[in-house]
């Protein structure tokens, strides 16, 4: 009998960084996550798996808590656009072990007048390599007769992405050509500047030849507190408010944890597979380890995620779209400090995706 190998394709973004953002709220690229395994067991003599995953989102919805404060004239605010291609290669090892290297490349931009003193409509941009992640994974059940399995993985995220990307900002009312070089919005930075540690759990259960269930959990632990990059951009906040930011540590970007949970079902129709899933993801206000200083866009997103996959002999083509159900920003530690100082409830706003979809191709060799 040929050795039975559980195949797991894990398109991980990051998007830019391993914990990237849906606008200002972190999101992981889990669309298509675990699809080979979720479609059942696969017999293979191949030793490698490759996944090329592409993500695009556009965001202009601005929430403070659950209150929508998106400007009627979108050009007066900030819109976010991100394109990320993730290259992930997995080496299959004996006894259901595997190792994975995840390399993201991103092109991110903000558009609008808000970052340019409400005077000029401009684009700020960041392009390049994101934060690379390496992980070791193990399937826990080895019996061929099992209708399901659970995989656990531990990894490390390296600060390879530029977390100090800069572009030009225009805020001189007397000279439209005058520009200030400064760090771009944290939502479009390519990395977070911290070495992180990841834990993940993936599982599936085969109900029948046509239906199987799956679940995924991912958590990025970021021990570093702040990365030293200024959190504000020229022209985006009043000078008086910046003094409050300094007092509460919100003037410098944080290096936050982030998490994703996802579960759903696959329905197989010969080579075509329809997937329906729910996903919950976000950035906590308090990290598991370390301090919680600095500017972070804390909050969570609950979404529905339908998708289609097409199976070939040794490969898989997939496309997913996320549909937001509930979105909320929450108070950060600097927000709580500002509330205490001013006596007024303070909360950091966050952008949320209005368009978000994933397209990818996975294969073994």
Task: Describe the residue ranges of each PLM region.
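Short sequence motifs at beta-strands and strand-loop junctions characteristic
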Residues: 77-82, 124-130, 189-196, 253-257, ...
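Bacterial Sec-dependent N-terminal signal peptides
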Residues: 1-24
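Outer membrane beta-barrel transmembrane domains
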Residues: 63-72, 220, 225-365
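Long, hydrophobic/aromatic-enriched structural stretches that serve as scaffold segments
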Residues: 4, 77-139
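Repeated loop/turn-to-beta-strand initiation elements of outer-membrane beta-barrel proteins
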Residues: 48, 61, 97-99, 143-145, ...
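Outer-membrane pore/translocation modules
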Residues: 111-252
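Residues on the lipid-exposed face of transmembrane beta-strands in outer-membrane beta-barrel proteins
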Residues: 38-41, 52-54, 87-91, 101, ...
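Outer-membrane beta-barrel biogenesis signature
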Residues: 19-64, 69-71, 141-151, 159-164, ...
